[in-house]
């Protein structure tokens, strides 16, 4: 009998009331996107200082770092500790998928530069352009590489400079770095492949209620999803292929 494959999710955000009520928390949101039958998915709420033992990292096939309301360039203890773990996972040649904050933190840990987004925050359905020559059609993207992909965006920071040896995989009219990879170890995505319309709208409503955005910004953000949806199935394929297959993403 094949040994059960294990994956670890670093949760860098608390569960919203909506996420808990609707999905049982963000753990389940991620597993619904990335998980397969027979796998074990463990979560550690790193934003609350909950981390796995270093000796236990070896037993996991792959790792996911979630989004967060915190800035990846902050020097709080849990963020610095997560940076150290990223470096250890790199040394171990482990697969690490970085989402939003995770995308930014991996860039920081690997020597890149992260800062407040120069063109302002995004809370919307965005369209990103794939750098076709940077990916091989027969690998994680499948037989055909699309020119563009839609993805839900929810962030106020950005990667300004890629780490050495990083490969740019996607960009947009708003941001120069929407997706990148480093060797076969890291795949990093600024958007949220795990989000859907309901999750985005709940975030917009909460941010609006907190006074962080204005009503017209909230309405414009929601309007981006009136006629279109995120390419969730395609993102699911990319992320699962990265975490669970061996071929290189790089040309």
UniProtKB/Swiss-Prot annotation:
GO terms for biological process: proteolysis. One of its GO terms (cellular component) is cytosol. Disulfide bonds: none annotated. Residues 16-213 form the Glutamine amidotransferase type-1 domain. It comes from the Eukaryota. Pathway: Secondary metabolite biosynthesis. Its EC number is 3.4.19.-. The active site is at residues 100, 192, 194. It is an enzyme of class 3 (hydrolase). It is found in: Cytoplasm, Cytosol. Keywords: Cytoplasm, Hydrolase, Protease. GO terms for molecular function: peptidase activity. Involved in glucosinolate biosynthesis. Hydrolyzes the gamma-glutamyl peptide bond of several glutathione (GSH) conjugates to produce Cys-Gly conjugates related to glucosinolates. The gamma-Glu-Cys-Gly-GSH conjugates are the sulfur-donating molecule in glucosinolate biosynthesis. Belongs to the peptidase C26 family. PANTHER family: GAMMA-GLUTAMYL PEPTIDASE 4, GLUTAMINE AMIDOTRANSFERASE YLR126C-RELATED. This is Gamma-glutamyl peptidase 4. It comes from Arabidopsis thaliana (Mouse-ear cress). The gene is GGP4.
